[in-house]
Amino acid sequence: MPAASLIQRLNAQINREFYSSHLCLHLSAWCAQHSLTGSANFLRSQAQNNVTHMMRVFNFMKQSGGMPSVGTMPPPKCECLNLEELFQQTLDDYYLRHDTLSGLKEEARAANAVKVESFLLSLSKEQDRDGKMLVAILEQVKEAKRAGLCMNQADRKLLALIERCH
């Protein structure tokens, strides 16, 4: 079983992924409310990815003899006025999860917890793909804004990008 501090940090990662899923669903609802179907669908897919990451950590902890714990959380704040703010919020959240996961990998390496480190490396690779997609989407949104496109037009361009990448 991993050290108590690693168990605590793994539980924090579970809850971080859970929050991110909740955030993506909340932002997806905002997009749907503004008839931004492509972005809404993408964010629902991202929410599912985050739940999958959460469950992977949960299952790893159980298999390693730890006791996973999912806490409660307040609803995320969504005060977005446009797609750029919305996708910046998702990217900021990704960076927070990425940094947390990187710190956890370092702690596992320092503790010589090889199984934990190996597991976290595979999880990190999955998250890196998500991060690259979010960066590409945000760049596409900024490009659409510079071109003077409205949110619905930008959303259609995003849908084409997302379909190419998935």
Task: Pin down the residues of each PLM region.
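Iron-associated oxidoreductase/ferritin-like identity signal
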Residues: M1-H166
